[in-house]
């Protein structure tokens, strides 16, 4: 492979590092550019999500480059949701009918560093930090970067933007006139809080993803290897009950004492975390096309960022990398054919998980605590046990398989019709039994 065939990957986050590994294994020389300093030598940004949920799609991508065992060594399996009511005891809801399948809480930084180490160790990958893309010629492949030493230019035969939801590559393609985009932001934002270890141990059950559903607000907590939990509070960004309305220590303490009373004694730095951690934005990014001239392409969040409520952002981006690798195989490494094929294969799937993630937000915030929801989940798990392989819940198909997201949506629509009928019958039967019992008492 000659020097002119070098591939530039812009963004050394999760997707970019994995992509660099896959391309290098194909024999390409890869230049991996990152706007930040080397993350292995610094500390994470305050308030930046420090853990994520890794499931089968992400594990499949890691397995293909031999990194699954290393990454999973520090993973914490979560086999279900622990629902925390305002009053009363928490209730565990299993993710799978068998109860033995789990999604995995992983340190974002540790995962990024493992992928970065793997990429940097390959002889045909070079990594350039502190390189912020400020110019791109899509037809010529020439890039301009802002660095601490001033502006520098570089040229690549193919430029791939793996630089996240705020992608500079996508911005350059927009300026060029090569694509259109839509950014749909939620009225909700998020703020991260911390539950430290209690007496050196986890303060909550580490085998569950904890959810505090409160209707207008919601909080989740994921375990970390250091026995802490990272909590994420989701709340409207503006209004009378929102992040904007709450600022004084007394008001913060009162809010949590009222809505999240079991959290207060577990989070001694609650007020400080709330006051100093930033409010993050939540939104869905869509754009088309994902490539221009067969030599500049977008992948992962740069092409299709989603809200985090299905825990599929990183998993979906990793699956993108696997699919692009497959397209290069089928197109004999002809990028002008592989990039359009990649978009054709992935765009419907990206839209499907974007919609499912938004729907899951409503489910987590409003429905998980309701008796009807619990009955429906019990019916689903019963059907999974009674019809193994023939009936599979949406959550299992998304999290524990590599079934294409769009196919999952189609299959689940048909299944939900069955579940709805059975659940309605169960509720009616229960109501009839109650009425009969009351009648006998009279």
Where are these regions (language model features)?
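Beta1/beta-strand and adjacent pyrophosphate-binding region of the FAD-binding site
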Residues: 2-15
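C-terminal helical "tail/cap" subdomain of flavin- and related membrane-associated enzymes
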Residues: 3, 326-442
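Conserved hydrophobic helix-helix packing surfaces used for dimerization/oligomerization
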Residues: 7-9, 30, 296
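Conserved mid-domain beta->alpha element of the FAD-binding
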Residues: 12-20, 25, 161, 193, ...
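Conserved Rossmann-like nucleotide-cofactor binding loop
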Residues: 15, 38, 166
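Glycine-rich FAD pyrophosphate-binding loop
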Residues: 24-47
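Active-site-adjacent segment of FAD-dependent monooxygenases/related oxidoreductases
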Residues: 42-118
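Conserved FAD-binding catalytic core of PHBH/FMO-like flavoproteins
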Residues: 117, 122, 131-135, 140-282, ...
């Amino acid at each position: 492979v000659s020097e002119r065939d070098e591939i530039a990957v812009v963004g050394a986050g999760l997707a970019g590092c994995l992509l660099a590994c896959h391309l290098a294994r194909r024999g390409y020389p890869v230049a991996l550019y990152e706007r930040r300093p080397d993350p292995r030598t610094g500390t994470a940004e305050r308030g930046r999500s420090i853990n994520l949920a890794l499931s089968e799609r992400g594990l499949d991508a890691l397995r293909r480059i031999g990194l699954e065992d290393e990454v999973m060594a520090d993973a914490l399996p979560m086999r279900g949701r622990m629902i925390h009511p305002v009053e009363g005891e928490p209730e565990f809801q299993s993710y799978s009918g068998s109860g033995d399948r789990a999604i995995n809480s992983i340190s974002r930084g540790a995962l990024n560093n493992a992928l970065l180490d793997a990429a940097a160790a390959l002889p045909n990958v070079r990594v350039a930090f502190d390189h912020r893309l400020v110019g791109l010629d899509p037809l010529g492949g020439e890039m301009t970067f802002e660095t601490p030493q001033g502006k520098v230019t570089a040229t690549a035969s193919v430029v791939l933007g793996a630089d996240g939801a705020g992608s500079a590559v996508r911005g350059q393609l927009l300026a060029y006139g090569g694509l259109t985009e839509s950014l749909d932001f939620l009225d909700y934002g998020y703020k991260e809080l911390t539950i430290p270890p209690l007496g050196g141990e986890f303060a909550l059950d580490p085998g569950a993803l904890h959810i505090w559903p409160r209707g207008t607000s919601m909080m989740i907590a994921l375990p970390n290897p250091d026995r802490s939990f990272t909590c994420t509070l989701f709340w409207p960004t503006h209004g009378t009950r929102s992040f904007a309305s709450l600022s004084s220590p007394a008001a913060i303490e009162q809010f949590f004492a009222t809505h999240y009373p079991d959290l207060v004694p577990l989070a001694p730095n609650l007020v400080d975390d709330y006051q100093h951690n930033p409010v993050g934005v939540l939104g869905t990014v869509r754009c088309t096309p994902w490539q221009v001239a067969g030599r500049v392409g977008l992948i992962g969040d740069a092409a299709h960022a989603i809200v985090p409520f299905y825990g599929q952002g990183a998993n979906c981006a990793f699956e993108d990398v696997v699919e692009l690798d497959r397209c290069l195989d089928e197109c004999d490494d002809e990028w002008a054919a592989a990039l359009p094929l990649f978009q054709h294969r992935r765009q419907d799937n990206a839209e499907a998980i974007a919609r499912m993630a938004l729907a899951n937000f409503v489910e987590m915030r409003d429905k998980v605590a309701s008796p009807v929801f619990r009955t429906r989940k019990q019916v689903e798990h019963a059907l999974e046990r009674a019809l193994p392989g023939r009936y599979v819940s949406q959550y299992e198909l998304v999290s524990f398989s590599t079934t294409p997201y769009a196919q999952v949506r189609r299959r689940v629509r048909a299944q939900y019709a069955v579940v709805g009928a059975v659940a309605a019958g169960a509720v009616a039967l229960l109501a009839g039994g109650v009425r009969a019992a009351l009648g006998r008492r009279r």
